[in-house]
Each structure stands twice: as structure tokens, then as C-alpha cells.
């Protein structure tokens, strides 16, 4: 069993690396642990992670992001928009080193942190781009990818207008969503179609590993 001592304002405590982490991250488990430590300490101090989230980083943030690789074919290109502190892009890159992942983040302090994590963990399959997904300069720099991911970025309709232009025709946006996803689909259906989206699917991943599986919505770019 692996333990790490994490310093926080209320003292020091030990966190156990959950057994599921070894299943999800395999040979890259130590990188996942190092990322967890970075979020719990540096990430919290710099305001990327709220103090209340630190004790539940594994379950609510790292593991549920790592399992989204179940929805992706081998060796594809992925763009993670509004990457923030690297969720879901960094756990995905650790779990799936075969993927080529671009992290798109507009804020300087967060993009600096993402580059620090990339270098510290030797994530050769990660590229960091500072900017917004809807900006022409970013779209030109990133090009077209197979899948665009996101987590807690925007309402579904707006998310589709930002994500789908980065996706190859026939590719997909795959967004992490909560229990209200069906309501979002109904509310934003016209906006999704206008953005060129079709073939909407909702499914879960990580059922065999997580107590609360991750819910994903997948939308294919038709035009």
C-alpha cells in the first residue's frame, strides 16, 4: 500500500492510494501519485483546487478522469479544452500514453502550471496551448483532432460550439457531465445541431473500478 504525507492548513494527514489507481494507470501509477501530490499541495496553494477537495482528489477528480480513456481508440489525437489544472487531460495522458493530447487553457497561471506538470512527469504525449478553444489562432495551432474532451467547462450547447470546430468530420466531442445531462440535451438540441453535432450518446465508464462511474456525453461532428 502506498502512502503520501500531505501538508494542509489544518495539519498533516496520510492519503492511501486507492487500489483502482493501479488498474487505471498501470505502469504509470507513480506519475499519477506525483500528480495527486502536486494538486494537493501546489495546486491547492495556487488556488486551482479548493481545500475541501483535497481529501477527495483521487475519487472525485483523478480516477474519474483517468477512466475516460475507455471511450477512446488507440493512438488518436485529443484536445482537452478549458483544461484548468489538467482535468481530465493529465490523468488521461497518464493512463493512456498512446494518445496525443493537447491541453487548451486560457489563463496564464494555469497554463504555466500545466507545463510544469508536463515537464515534471515527463509527459511526452502532452502539448500545452494557451488560449480559448473558440479563438481562430488556437484552432489554427491545434488543427483538427479525433476527440475533444472537457469537464465542467460550460453548458452543453455552448460547449458544442467550442468543441466541434476542433473535431475532424466524423470525430467526436466527449464531455464529462453530471446527472442533468439529459435535460441539457433537450434544452440545447438546436444549438448542438447548428454546431454540426449529431448522434448524441450518453454512457458511463469505469463501472468495474469506481463506486461512482463517470458519465460521458458523446456528440459526433457531421459537418
Swiss-Prot record:
Where does this polypeptide localize? Cytoplasm
User: Is S-adenosyl-L-methionine included in the keywords of this UniProt record?
Assistant: yes
Q: Which region is the signal sequence?
A: none
Chief location of this protein within or outside the cell: cytoplasm
Which GO molecular function terms does the record list? rRNA (guanine-N7-)-methyltransferase activity
Enumerate the residues binding S-adenosyl-L-methionine: 82, 87, 133-134, 151
Q: What is its EC number?
A: 2.1.1.-
Q: Which Pfam families match?
A: GidB
Enzyme class, spelled out: transferase
User: Which cellular component terms (GO) are annotated to the entry?
Assistant: cytosol
Recite the UniProt keywords alphabetically: Cytoplasm, Methyltransferase, rRNA processing, S-adenosyl-L-methionine, Transferase
What role is this protein assigned?
Specifically methylates the N7 position of guanine in position 518 of 16S rRNA.
Q: Which family does it belong to?
A: Belongs to the methyltransferase superfamily. RNA methyltransferase RsmG family.
Annotated protein name in UniProt? Ribosomal RNA small subunit methyltransferase G
Source organism per entry reads: Corynebacterium glutamicum (strain ATCC 13032 / DSM 20300 / JCM 1318 / BCRC 11384 / CCUG 27702 / LMG 3730 / NBRC 12168 / NCIMB 10025 / NRRL B-2784 / 534)
This protein's gene is called rsmG
Amino acid at each position: 500500500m502506498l502512502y503520501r504525507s500531505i501538508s494542509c492548513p489544518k495539519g498533516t494527514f496520510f492519503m492511501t492510494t486507492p487500489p483502482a489507481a493501479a488498474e487505471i494507470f498501470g505502469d504509470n501509477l507513480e506519475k499519477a501519485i506525483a500528480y495527486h501530490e502536486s494538486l494537493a499541495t501546489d495546486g491547492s496553494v495556487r488556488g486551482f483546487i479548493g481545500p475541501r477537495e483535497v481529501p477527495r482528489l483521487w475519487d472525485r477528480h483523478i480516477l474519474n478522469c483517468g477512466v475516460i480513456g475507455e471511450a477512446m481508440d488507440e493512438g488518436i489525437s485529443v484536445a482537452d479544452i478549458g483544461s484548468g489544472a489538467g482535468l481530465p487531460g493529465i490523468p488521461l495522458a497518464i493512463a493512456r500514453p498512446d494518445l496525443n493530447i493537447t491541453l487548451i487553457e486560457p489563463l496564464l497561471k494555469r497554463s504555466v502550471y500545466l507545463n510544469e506538470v508536463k515537464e515534471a512527469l515527463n509527459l511526452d504525449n502532452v502539448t500545452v496551448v494557451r488560449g480559448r478553444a473558440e479563438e481562430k489562432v488556437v484552432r489554427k495551432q491545434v488543427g483538427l483532432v479525433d476527440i475533444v474532451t472537457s469537464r465542467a467547462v460550460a453548458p452543453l450547447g455552448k460547449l458544442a460550439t467550442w468543441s466541434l470546430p476542433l473535431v475532424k468530420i466524423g470525430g467526436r466531442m466527449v464531455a464529462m457531465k453530471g446527472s442533468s445531462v439529459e435535460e441539457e440535451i433537450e434544452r440545447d438540441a438546436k444549438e448542438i445541431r447548428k454546431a454540426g453535432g449529431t448522434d448524441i450518446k450518453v454512457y458511463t465508464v469505469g463501472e468495474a473500478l469506481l463506486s461512482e462511474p463517470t458519465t460521458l456525453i458523446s456528440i459526433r461532428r457531421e459537418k
